From Swiss-Prot:
The keyword Plastid does not apply. It comes from the Bacteria. Disulfide bonds: none annotated. Keywords: Acyltransferase, Transferase. PROSITE patterns: GNAT. Residues 1-146 form the N-acetyltransferase domain. This is Probable acetyltransferase HI_0677. Signal peptide: none annotated. It holds the Pfam family Acetyltransf_1. One of its GO terms (molecular function) is acyltransferase activity, transferring groups other than amino-acyl groups. Gene3D superfamilies: 3.40.630.30.
């Protein structure tokens, strides 16, 4: 398995995986709109993706990060809103690798906070990666030291 930060030229690798993610949450297939959504997120630096690919270069998982700013803390932090792994024998390990890559990126950008707003069925995965539920904000948070 390889993990890498997606760029615009990787959208065709990400597109079928992102469509599978949307369909897993009950959304109708719409590759044209999905392509436009992904293209615009990357083009305007509104979010970034890390993609996991298997030995055949097929995308098997991704995590999407959005930059956030805290006026009170005077710093940037990152938010995971989407993480998805295809049904796979090593699904737990792939999720962990994607979260680890996100943590590394947060360190790289000299941020010290990563929050996640995910489906309830992913709560245990977040907790196993050190995230704590902040009931006031209904988000999982992970503080990282730079």
């Amino acid at each position: 398995m390889k993990l890498f930060k997606a760029e615009q030229w990787n959208i065709e690798v990400l597109l079928p995986l992102f469509e599978a993610y949307r369909q897993a949450y009950g959304q109708a297939e719409n590759p044209e709109r999905t392509l436009a959504f992904l293209t615009n997120r990357m083009r305007f630096n509104e979010s970034l993706f890390f993609i996991a690919v298997d030995e055949n270069e097929k995308a098997i998982g991704f995590v999407q990060l959005f930059p956030r700013l805290s006026s009170l803390q005077l710093q940037r932090y990152w938010q995971i809103t989407d993480i998805f792994v295809l049904e796979h024998a090593q699904q737990t390990e792939i999720y962990a690798a994607l979260i680890s890559k996100a943590k590394d990126f947060v360190h790289f950008t000299q941020s010290n906070r990563l929050v996640a707003e995910l489906a309830q069925n992913q709560y245990s995965m977040l907790e196993s990666e050190g995230f704590k539920l902040n009931p006031k904000e209904r988000l999982f948070e992970l503080s990282l030291s730079c």
